[in-house]
């Protein structure tokens, strides 16, 4: 006789960092997020990027059109900051409830970021307006200078960009997104109530050895890149401590299989189908399941000043096999942990 499965019931979570793409890709991936999460902060790095209120409204509608009947899901839209963005347009979007936050991509830091900001000084009028409005700034925290080693770009960003910015605009709300280093974990932990962080499942579960030892695993390649074990452990310890300003942000970033498994593959993990169970596995390994619901469902709304979701989801602890691939128009998607057996999954 098998032992009864363990069930975890938590308030419905939100995903505070997701890429839903557009077109056929959007139609394929949206249901994996809308089935589980009540809300999601949607990244604006389309081609062209979402820089106007009208573009955000149109994109939001395309997302909603892809949500299956029976899913109760609200996309929270963001504005892509550029060197030439009009502060009045940003303010209008925020006041009208179209923009929840604005996203700072250093130019060329990641996928579709060539329109990103070349220097924080260039967009200071926009950031000052955001500070005045109480509008959160979401930051991809990496410098992009060619002479900086890719494994050092996050730590260098803290000292050269993030800290000077927060010293200059002391009332600005900042989310340090997808943190990957001990440096960032300590920086956010020691910061004030205006600084928070999202953490992905892959950066909690894996380090660069998993991606590079015994063969290159392209489906673990994302930006910021996986770091040393010491950094992975610092992230795990931060979430296991019950720290209240760290919350779930999958950074689910789908690319067609042929764009990942190639001589110059794209960065991003499509983890929407498996992320919640992956987080549960980490919290269980750290003997921290008591803090799991807060990380997934409570800390994010608190930081954003939003109410928590009224419904609940259940995860079951029984081994399940993750599909090796998901059909995508004339290609396929490989989900995070595809072809592997996982311990926790959404019931």
From Swiss-Prot:
Comment on bound cofactor: Binds 2 Zn(2+) ions per subunit.
Q: What is its EC number?
A: 3.5.2.3
Residues that hold Zn(2+) 1 according to the record: 17, 19, 103, 251
Superkingdom of origin: Bacteria
Q: What does this protein do?
A: Catalyzes the reversible cyclization of carbamoyl aspartate to dihydroorotate.
| Family per record | Belongs to the metallo-dependent hydrolases superfamily. DHOase family. Class II DHOase subfamily.
The molecule here is called: Dihydroorotase
The protein's organism comes out as Citrobacter koseri (strain ATCC BAA-895 / CDC 4225-83 / SGSC4696)
